[in-house]
């Protein structure tokens, strides 16, 4: 009796201790969760993941590795390096932890198709709104559901053929770009930096009705007409800083709130003040004023649909991110690869010469939306750059309910894999676009000729540079048209394009909301 009493007292003594209660609760939770997952797999017809990875630190180590690789320009390629190291590399899908929470990563085209299209309603943007909203607010890139549908319906007409086809509006900005290139004759310079200034100039003219004219500076004997706009001098730097910060918040996933520094908040305020200037200017116009405006202005068309300054600012900033960065990044990679491949330049110039002329014989007036679409080799060059360097190399979605992905489970990796409600699925089109099983042994080689081969024309979901499904990029034709026009004009005007042959290849990449060259596009061009 005494022995039983002693045991009872010992149990009562220990069972109330936190160091007993907590581990016991975890064990009980894990047991219940294990059987719950088994029941879900059985109900949904899913198998055990073929590849389950761990970093050995319950997922606490990986975010710091990613932050480090982001700083040295290797985070994008890190997404590829992990797949050959999987236990079953032939199955390009795996489960892994971040901060003890299990995520799924995939580059399988069938899984990407499911996420973006066939099972679209099973997935949402998850925490993306919380990651990005401090800078770009509630817009097409941050909203789900009814809010997203409303934004898309509002914006779709603004990217109709008649709005994106006016390539002649680009020519004044191209002429200023020429001045910067000519001043560097015989010297190496960063073309990427100029492309980002060029696209912010053209994008703000399209969006706001007047360009910020960032290219017009004292180095070429020009001044910007917008220099007196309050905050204009700080805008570009603040915009760049905030975008870089947002990329870091995305890495932190549900712990994004840890990153909310003072400078980030200050830069957001600068960007908002800049956009608000143009929004207020548009709101001050009467209906009669809007009707009398010559030419197309994105903001003025939006004002006809809503007069809510917050909505207008958010939509403008959402589109500005895409309108500036996507095209600037694409052009930077195009000229980086052209400078490395003189044979490609020769073929491209032959096509341009035939269609539009070169040098003093250039027939600029013949360069139109329609004629650019007929330049097959130019399209192949752009497609090859979008394949190797997609503007948004990595993305994620979050399951809105317990569901599956078509592949990634079982011994052969061909069975469905369970995705639990609230679970994040990462997908890397950058890695998908470089799969040897799809593109052959030369998958990492820049070779535009592949786009004339029958196999490449049947890629389906193995080539998604502008996303796919209901959320496919509205502005893709805008970006392609602008990139095509600028490429043609630069190759018409300049005969020499070279790159330091000792430059690191493959290049390091910078990942903000979109991808660009970490070390710039340093070329000689004259």
UniProtKB/Swiss-Prot annotation:
Gene3D superfamilies: Cytochrome P450. Induction: By N-alkanes. This is Cytochrome P450 52A5. It is an enzyme of class 1 (oxidoreductase). The gene is CYP52A5. Together with an NADPH cytochrome P450 the enzyme system catalyzes the terminal hydroxylation as the first step in the assimilation of alkanes and fatty acids. Its main location: membrane. The lineage of its organism: Eukaryota, Fungi, Dikarya, Ascomycota, Saccharomycotina. It comes from Candida maltosa. Heme binds at residue 473. GO terms for molecular function: heme binding; iron ion binding; oxidoreductase activity, acting on paired donors, with incorporation or reduction of molecular oxygen, reduced flavin or flavoprotein as one donor, and incorporation of one atom of oxygen. PROSITE patterns: CYTOCHROME_P450.
């Amino acid at each position: 009796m005494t022995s039983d009493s002693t045991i009872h007292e010992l149990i009562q003594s220990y069972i109330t201790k936190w160091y007993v209660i907590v581990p016991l609760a975890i064990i009980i939770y894990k047991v219940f969760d294990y059987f719950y997952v088994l029941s879900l797999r059985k109900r949904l017809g899913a198998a055990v993941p073929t590849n389950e990875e761990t970093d050995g630190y319950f997922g606490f180590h990986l975010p710091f590795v990613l932050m480090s690789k982001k700083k040295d320009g290797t985070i994008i390629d890190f997404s590829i390096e992990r797949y050959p190291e999987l236990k079953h590399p032939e199955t390009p899908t795996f489960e892994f932890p971040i901060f003890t929470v299990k995520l799924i990563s995939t580059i399988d085209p069938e899984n990407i198709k499911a996420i973006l299209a066939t099972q679209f309603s099973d997935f949402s943007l998850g925490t993306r709104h919380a990651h990005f909203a401090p800078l770009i607010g509630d817009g097409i890139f941050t909203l789900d559901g009814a809010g997203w549908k409303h934004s898309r319906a509002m914006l779709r007409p603004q990217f109709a053929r008649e709005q994106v086809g006016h390539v002649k509006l680009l020519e004044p900005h191209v002429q200023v770009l020429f001045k910067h290139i000519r001043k560097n004759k015989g010297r190496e310079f960063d073309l990427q930096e100029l492309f980002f200034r060029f696209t912010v100039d053209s994008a703000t003219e399209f969006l706001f009705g007047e360009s910020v004219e960032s290219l017009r500076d004292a180095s070429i004997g020009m001044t910007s007409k917008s220099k007196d706009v309050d905050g204009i001098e700080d805008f570009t730097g603040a915009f760049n800083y905030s975008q870089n910060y947002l990329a870091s918040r995305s890495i932190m996933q549900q712990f994004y709130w840890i990153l909310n520094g003072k400078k980030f908040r200050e830069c957001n305020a600068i960007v908002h003040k800049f956009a608000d200037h143009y929004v207020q200017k548009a709101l001050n116009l009467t209906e009669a004023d809007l009707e009398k405006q010559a030419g197309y202005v994105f903001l003025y068309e939006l004002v006809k649909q809503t007069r809510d300054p917050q909505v207008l600012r958010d939509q403008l900033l959402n589109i500005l991110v895409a309108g500036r960065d996507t095209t600037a990044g694409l052009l930077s990679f195009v000229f980086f690869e052209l400078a490395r491949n003189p044979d490609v330049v020769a073929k491209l110039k032959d096509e341009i010469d035939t269609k539009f002329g070169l040098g003093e014989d250039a027939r600029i007036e013949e360069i139109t939306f329609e004629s650019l679409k007929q330049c097959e080799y130019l399209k192949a060059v752009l497609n090859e750059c979008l394949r190797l360097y997609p503007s948004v190399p990595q993305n994620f979605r979050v399951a809105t309910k317990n569901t599956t992905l078509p592949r990634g489970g079982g011994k052969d990796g061909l069975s469905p894999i369970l995705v639990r409600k609230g679970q994040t699925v990462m997908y890397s089109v950058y890695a998908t676009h470089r799969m040897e099983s799809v593109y052959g042994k030369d998958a990492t080689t820049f070779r535009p000729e592949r786009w004339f081969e029958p196999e490449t024309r049947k890629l389906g979901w193995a080539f998604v540079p502008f996303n796919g499904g209901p959320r496919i990029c509205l502005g893709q034709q805008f970006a392609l048209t602008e990139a095509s026009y600028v490429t043609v004009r630069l190759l018409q005007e300049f005969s020499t394009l070279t790159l330091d042959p000792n430059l690191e290849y493959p290049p390091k990449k910078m990942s903000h909301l979109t991808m660009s060259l970490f070390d710039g596009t340093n070329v000689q061009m004259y």
